[in-house]
């Protein structure tokens, strides 16, 4: 950051989740348990998508990509959070903070784009079933995944670069438990209106455009589903789409609330828990949402466990 003094180069102090030290062990246990569930749930989906031949479809290719993103998304912030909750030190190095800023933005924006890609995949599956395999071929699937990754990287470079140009005010106390743009803007001296405008502009683009595409896709999907004569077919299509819509609502809702509110005006404790929601809670519940009513995943898991018992 321009104007950064020597002390700031030594690192930042993460203020954490709560101002009450007596609650830190409770938060540590709860967050550790949630993180372990995140690792288990998303790793299971990735393994099933790779090992089960019946799941070698575009839908599960993108779902395994989403699980990989969720694993990385949670891992970019939770281990540091656990370290700070466990010990007396609440610091993060300058390099660690900057790395976290870039990676968190990259993964978050990539997930925004990937959710749009998954909506497109569902649209083709429901509205163009006879051409689904031809349209969603492996080459296109990989291309869409790469576009999502590069789009997220572009967002990270733009927002992080603008944020790192801000001069610091002298103190190194980052409100919250991770280095992200709204928290870093609060550390700045002088006029931050340009940074806030860039933040709002980029976040609005990564929210309004994807959500518009998703809404249009699901309106078309709903029309197609209502034309299905089989009640079982309608139920299966609605269940698959409902899972994706719930994930979209959780991720976009919490991320938009955390990033589009003015950094200077948002409530401190509220902002911390919103950040916790999209950095840990959403990655934890995504596997549950996609698998609880998904018979294909349940069947694949039973077959995999059955093979494990036979080998044992």
Swiss-Prot record:
Record localization: Cell membrane
Regions of this protein lying in the Extracellular compartment: 1-25, 80-100, 159-196, 260-272
UniProt keyword terms in alphabetical order: Cell membrane, Disulfide bond, G-protein coupled receptor, Glycoprotein, Membrane, Olfaction, Receptor, Sensory transduction, Transducer, Transmembrane, Transmembrane helix
InterPro entries xrefs: GPCR_Rhodpsn (IPR000276), GPCR_Rhodpsn_7TM (IPR017452), Olfact_rcpt (IPR000725)
Gene3D superfamilies cross-referenced by the UniProt entry: Rhodopsin 7-helix transmembrane proteins (1.20.1070.10)
Disulfide bonds: 97-189
GO molecular function annotations of the record: G protein-coupled receptor activity; odorant binding; olfactory receptor activity
UniProt GO cellular component terms: cell cortex; plasma membrane
SUPFAM superfamilies associated with the record: Family A G protein-coupled receptor-like
Protein name according to UniProt: Olfactory receptor 2C1
Organism (species): Homo sapiens
Gene: OR2C1
């Amino acid at each position: 950051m321009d104007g950064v003094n020597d002390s700031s180069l030594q690192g930042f102090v993460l203020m954490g989740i709560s101002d009450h030290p007596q609650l830190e062990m409770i938060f540590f246990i709860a967050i550790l348990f949630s993180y372990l569930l995140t690792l288990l749930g998303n790793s299971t989906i990735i393994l099933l998508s790779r090992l089960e031949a019946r799941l070698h479809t575009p839908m599960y290719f993108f779902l395994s990509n989403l699980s990989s993103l969720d694993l990385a998304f949670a891992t970019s912030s939770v281990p540091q959070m656990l370290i700070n909750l466990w010990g007396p030190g609440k610091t993060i190095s300058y390099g660690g903070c900057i790395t976290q800023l870039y990676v968190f933005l990259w993964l978050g924006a990539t997930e925004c784009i990937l959710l749009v890609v998954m909506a497109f995949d569902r649209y083709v599956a429901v509205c163009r079933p006879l051409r689904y395999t031809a349209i969603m071929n492996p080459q296109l699937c990989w291309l869409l995944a790469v576009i999502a990754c590069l789009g997220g990287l572009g967002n990270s470079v733009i927002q992080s670069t603008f944020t790192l140009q801000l001069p610091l005010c002298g103190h190194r106390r980052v409100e919250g438990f991770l280095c992200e743009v709204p928290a870093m803007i609060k550390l700045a001296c002088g006029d931050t209106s340009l940074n806030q405008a860039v933040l709002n502009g980029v976040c609005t683009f990564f929210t309004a455009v994807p959500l518009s595409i998703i809404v249009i896709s699901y309106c078309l999907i709903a029309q197609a589903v209502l034309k299905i004569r089989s009640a079982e077919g309608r139920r299966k299509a609605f269940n698959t789409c409902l899972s994706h819509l719930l994930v979209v609502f959780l991720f976009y809702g919490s991320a938009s609330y955390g990033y589009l509110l003015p950094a200077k005006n948002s409530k401190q404790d509220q902002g911390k828990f919103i950040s916790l929601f999209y950095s840990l809670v959403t990655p934890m519940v995504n596997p549950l949402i996609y698998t609880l009513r998904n018979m294909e995943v349940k069947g694949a898991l039973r077959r995999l466990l059955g093979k494990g018992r036979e080998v044992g």
